[in-house]
Amino acid sequence: MDLNDLKIDPEFEEKIPPLTEDEFSLLEQNIVADGEVLDPLIVWNNTILDGHNRYRILKKHPEIPFRTYPKDFSDKYEAIAWICNNQLGRRNLTPEQRRYLIGKRYEAEKASHGGHYTEPDAETGQFTVSLSGEDLRLPERTSEKIAAETNTSRSFVENAERFAKGVDAAEAAVPGIRSG
């Protein structure tokens, strides 16, 4: 894939905590010293999901080789949920950044598939409920699913969504407030 084919969606990028100037500079030095980008840029429909900083470095150094790894999602909300979940794996998140990402993931997953989460039947792909009572599976709340995966509580996840909406509102009122 050509570098010029890739796009940055501001809605996706704003879910990713920014690097400090020192962190960005160190990343650039490492990429230039390695002579390649070691980690692939993760993309969905040529839009970058992970690798925004690497992409900016590549724009400054177009001679450096890179790879992409495509992901498949049914809509932008699934992509946003993936971005948030992927960022939650970072070790250097502040508690506020983690809370924001959990809130945005919850918001995106609700928008993608509604407020409940169930797995489709393995054979049919259909979402079904057995009336026999033996295999009755009630839909799991999206907040409960995320809470279990992030070692938090349902109320934490639901409060994190309100926190994230507040952060977004503050950012809309005073641009740049989120990054410091």
What are these regions (language model features)?
Residues 1-71, 78-92:
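Short, charged/polar connector segments at secondary-structure boundaries
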